[in-house]
Amino acid sequence: MDNPTDSAGKCPVAHGNTPRSRSNRDWWPDQLNVQILHHNSGRADPLGQAFDYAEEFKKLHLHGLKKDLHALMTDSQDWWPADFGHYGGLFIRMAWHSAGTYRITDGRGGAGQGQQRFAPLNSWPDNANLDKARRLLWPIKQKYGNRISWADLLILTGNVALESMGFKTFGFAGGRADVWEPEELFWGPEGTWLGDERYSGERELAEPLGAVQMGFIYVNPEGPNGNSDPLASARDIRETFARMAMNDEETVALIAGGHTFGKKHGAGEPFLIGPEPEGGAIEDQGLGWKSSFGTGVGKDAITAGLEVTWSQTPTKWSNYFFENLFAFEWELTTSPAGAKQWQAKNAEASIPDAYDASKRHLPTMLTSDLALRFDPTYEKISRHFLENPGEFADAFARAWFKLTHRDMGPKVRYLGPEVPAEDLIWQDVIPAVDHPLVDDKDIAELKEKVLATGLTVQELVSTAWASASTFRGSDKRGGANGARVRLAPQKDWDANQPAQLAKVLGVLESIQKDFNAAQTGAKKISLADLIVLAGAAGVEKAAAAGGNAVSVPFTPGRIDASEAQTDAHSFAALEPRIDGFRNYLNGKRHQFMKPEEALVDRAQLLTLTGPEMTALVGGLRVLKAGAPEHGVFTSRPETLTNDFFVNLLDMGTQWVPVAGKEGFYEGRDRKTGAAKWTGTRVDLIFGSHSQLRAFAEVYGQADAKGKFVNDFVAAWNKVMNADRFDLV
């Protein structure tokens, strides 16, 4: 008979002490993370692979939804009361913070996937109490179901909040499909909230980051690290907003426009706030930041610790932000929570209380607000808006639209009746097709003409890759459509081998001109299409040389963008510092990733899987699409074979570092010591990393020659069509 234990009568479930299995990254933290290529693969999608959000959105009664949202704005709930009887300020902040994580360096972040619902964003200090905003929306999301995604609903609610307070918005586009798991993204090196290890030197912010501290969307409203210096704050603001693709005028308009509404909350000390949603108890059901100060809500709410209301009419559009900014001199004070903020000197108490109509407060501002007055450039813009409120309203409307739609990609992806007709340069405009497209007979004829020019496989493939591989699945920018590879800045990028690119484009433009001139009707071939078609011809020629007859798919319909439709400054962010597919590394620019990390990062932006990335690298190497002296592990260059994998995995080769050239290696015959190959970290990672080696072994097998060619062609076609949203 078993003896009773001391735990008899206790709950058998372990609380808080269940052992956690260690992941491979725990054991080897520097291990290359290939798993990011397989996140949001669809297996976690409860709606299934057949679900078409665009079709569901078309069934949405947008007017009815907006009517319900308007009603919600003033339907104050006891569990989270509305400031001033209106949730507008809360919902503007929710939408702003959903979109505001966008960063132009890699196009990641933003509102496009509804990531604010998931960790870590749902628990960032700067997103405190936005969990309540989303819970207020749940009955409406529940009512309209799959016809409106969370990602779209968060932004639409921000628009309706503005409209309900008398502001005329620029428009709204739907089309943001939800994802169902957190995005694994580099938000910074810090291990603590509000840490700022991302800086070096004279406050140089590490790339690709945009925010100043871990857990902030933008800047610290109290000033850099709490230093209440408006000019220092202006420096942070300018850098941070530039990294999310905003210029000075847009920055001023956004800050002032957003701070026309609502208030900040700092009724009590920060230690009275409970854990964030991800750290909360199970019975809290995903609600965080529970406050033990007074009632914890309404007048007793604590969010950022600041207690600021900017306007005399915080639920109506006005010019009070600028009027107050310039009307008073300001003195530093502290909120009830101890946060540093500014109070108007010699002013009347003109600011309403959020919960007591009989009370009035002195005007208050944040350090980051005063930056708009004391920075000379911002001050000039701010005074102009003060004196021209109509221009301010238009600037804010446009900047808000840009903020909330920046990561949606080209206009063809926009859905709904409120899409503005005006084309905006940041949308990377591509004209509509206005002519008949080439048919199969034309395609065959054009391929023959391309191959008859004497252009090599390497030249054709390199040019097509340079055109298409700028695509970013993050913000849907780049890609072959538009043929912007022929325009500044892309035509001059070092990675694109400008001299060779100019030569190839000149030949292709001549073919295009002759073909179009020979047509009796309006049929045309765009240069954008011809670049991709020429690349396909090169791949087919290389495959045939290796004994594999393949037809690379080609669908015409790309069109050429003009220089006037291209924001060269904005496109500069797409220039590759490293392109592992081409074995390219720009030694003149700061690198913030190892070459192999940059390869996986680029593959993820191209929406490639691990096997697709592997097949493309192996094929591009033997086709000499990149640095000609490295990674070309074949005696048959410009022939599409699996030689890269066969020779990389050959145990007769010993790899040794090249003296004085970090990241470069020489492959020597293991017996004789004779040099055979040279390669980079990107090449050797396919033999070193266990998962990538497993992929490489599949393609290095004796029976894989045909499979490799077919897989390469499929992956190649995926990249060439990555920006063809008209085909989806």
UniProtKB/Swiss-Prot annotation:
EC number, UniProt record: 1.11.1.21
Stored Gene3D superfamilies: 1.10.520.10, Peroxidase, domain 2 (1.10.420.10)
A single Gene Ontology CC term: cytosol
Keyword Iron: yes
Location of cross-link Tryptophyl-tyrosyl-methioninium (Trp-Tyr) (with M-244): W96-Y218
UniProt cross-references to PANTHER family, sorted A to Z: CATALASE-PEROXIDASE, HYDROPEROXIDASE I, BIFUNCTIONAL CATALASE-PEROXIDASE
Annotated protein name in UniProt: Catalase-peroxidase
